[in-house]
């Protein structure tokens, strides 16, 4: 499904791996003309790659994402190829990206999309597995970033509320389009346990805070003692709920996957949680369509 600016997780890590963070980036008219949310880059002017990365990840500036993509990939099409190659390399076969900023798009092959499960894998790679994970975390954990441009002093503020509202979030990225709804992906750590959380379609205007309430509830549950004893289907859960009915990926495909066994909990403490009736006390704010994934990735 559409995943909005959570796309920028992959944009960031591909840029960090393929380019130097101190590169100078010249802005094209295409990048400068991107829609809000935007920094207001000026076509023909030059900016530091590091500053653009902070603008993209902290403030989610769309023009920064396009400028980065064109610099690294030669064009947005070339960069999309790099993104999709990386997605396939790390096992995200339900992901196909067209735009570096996550704005809804279609081409002759497909539409811009991912899954909650794939976004957890992408976040896991960004936070822990990439050779550039340290730089990625340094960027996404920064609460405020200041730099000087030809246009004057710029100040970026981090919009990832879970960095300050929980003790366990180490990275995250928000997103929104009218098609994707409010989205959020996060990396969580507690006592050596590493987990990722992904919410897609978690509310539409005027329910911007739904994702924060649900994400906090999921994080608190995931790091709790109760989660260690959970028996959950090890399946990527994409749930569409209308009234009292639900369907899941497993039901839709007819594929069964083994449950996580208690003796495996040292390596898989919690795989996935469905937002079904017994878990309503955990996640209660979702609207008609939602997707959640929580998982451990080592």
Q: Which residues fall in each region the model found?
A:
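Domain-terminus/edge residues, biased toward the C-terminal soluble/receptor-binding domains
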Residues: 92-96, 108-298
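Active-site-adjacent loops and short helices of periplasmic peptidoglycan-processing enzymes
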Residues: 1-117, 127-129
């Amino acid at each position: 499904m559409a995943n909005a600016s959570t796309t920028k997780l992959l944009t960031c890590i591909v840029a960090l791996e393929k380019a130097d963070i101190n590169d100078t980036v010249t802005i094209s008219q295409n990048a400068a003309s991107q829609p809000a949310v935007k920094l207001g880059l000026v076509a023909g002017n030059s900016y530091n790659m590091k500053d653009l990365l902070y603008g993209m990840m902290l403030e989610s500036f769309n023009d920064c994402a396009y400028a980065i993509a064109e610099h690294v990939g030669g064009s947005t099409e070339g960069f999309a190829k790099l993104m999709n190659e990386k997605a396939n390399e790390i096992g995200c076969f339900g992901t196909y990206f067209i735009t570096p900023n996550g704005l809804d798009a279609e081409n002759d092959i497909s539409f811009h999309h991912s899954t909650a499960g794939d976004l957890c894998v992408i976040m896991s790679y960004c936070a822990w597995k990439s050779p550039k994970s340290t730089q990625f975390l340094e960027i996404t954990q920064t609460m405020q970033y200041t730099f000087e441009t030809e246009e004057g002093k710029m100040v970026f503020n981090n919009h990832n509320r879970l960095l300050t509202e929980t003790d366990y979030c180490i990275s995250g990225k928000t997103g929104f389009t009218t098609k994707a709804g409010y989205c959020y992906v996060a990396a969580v750590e507690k006592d050596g346990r590493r987990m990722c959380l992904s919410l897609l379609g978690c509310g539409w205007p005027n329910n911007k805070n739904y994702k924060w309430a649900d994400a906090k509830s999921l994080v608190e549950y995931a790091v709790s003692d109760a989660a260690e004893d959970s028996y959950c289907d090890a399946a990527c859960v994409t749930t569409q709920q209308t009234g009292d009915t639900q369907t899941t990926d497993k039901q839709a495909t007819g594929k069964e996957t083994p449950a996580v066994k208690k003796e495996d909990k040292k390596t898989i403490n919690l795989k996935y949680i469905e937002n079904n009736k017994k878990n309503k006390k955990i996640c209660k704010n979702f609207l008609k369509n939602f997707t959640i994934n929580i998982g451990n990735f080592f």
